[in-house]
Amino acid sequence: MAQHRYQKLAFILVFFLISRAAAAQSAATAQLLPGQEVVYTGIYLMNLYDLNINEHSFYADFYIWFKWQGERDPMNIEFVNAVEKWGFTQNDFHEEPLELPDGFHYNGMRIEGRFYHPFDLYNFPLDRHQLGIHIENVDYQQDSLAYLPDSAAAFVREDFQMPGWNIGGATMESQSNLYKTNFGETGKTAAAFSNFTFKLNIARPISYFLLKLMLPLLIVIIASLGALFIHPAQLDARISLPIGGLLSAVFLQQSYSSALPDVGYMVLMDKIYLVSFGLIVAIMLRAILVGNQVAIQKKKEVDTAALKRADRRLAWWGIGFFIVLVLGLLLASSLRASGRM
């Protein structure tokens, strides 16, 4: 009985998988419209450089090729997010398409130019980006011609590097781009075009965040907390440390924010510095309050030992509070990034 039950479950599982595969294949076939010609498209990225976050753009040098069957020529394309077209270069592989042994037409081109990408900097300096290159056909709408990826994996030069960034791989996809306008041409309706997109995933290395941004700030925080280990009677020395720490934190914030474009929101690092400013100001206020208490009661017996113990406890609580808040901000940033992927 048990063996018969397992065989029945296995049969149901196999039937389910076959049904899902058939449904997926039917859905893919249903996406092709009557009279629509398919162009299999691939990209081989050679170089990507001059990544300019302030201008939201980058330069790319790559090959793009097309394989198709039919009379419609897919070579007359527009790079939708191309900018500075006066410096754009385009060199075709062949003057006329080649006939491949499998019956496909083949041609391509080498492209070099600047492309636009809106950088989302909410998670700076742990930000990740998908740099995209978008193409559409100028002559034919989606119901006549559709671009599809030539293979499951996009191609990138083997020794491809981007200094200051980690490369997370590349993808190609095809989607519909609907223009909800007739561009002023009477009698025409909104038009949809096949939009082919190449995406390169990049991310800043964690070492940039830890060593260049967090380490200097952590040193400033620890130096400011050192004021709570100085004798309560030495008010000038106790105040000078957090004041110096506050000025240093302001200068450190300016050093990285000057390299970012003007955005209307706080990036992750701004939020970390906001926590730092609050902690340093709290240290300074604590030093002032304790100093005033000692000055007022200097003619009386003041339990300085108790004050020093309280200050040291506050120092440890302060560093713990800072670490917990930073970890909370990092967790919120990670959840936000995961929601956008």
Question: Which residue stretches match the model-derived regions?
Answer:
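Hydrophobic core of alpha-helical transmembrane segments in multi-pass integral membrane proteins
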Residues: 16, 319-331
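Flexible extramembrane loops and terminal tails that flank transmembrane helices
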Residues: 177-178, 307, 315, 329-332
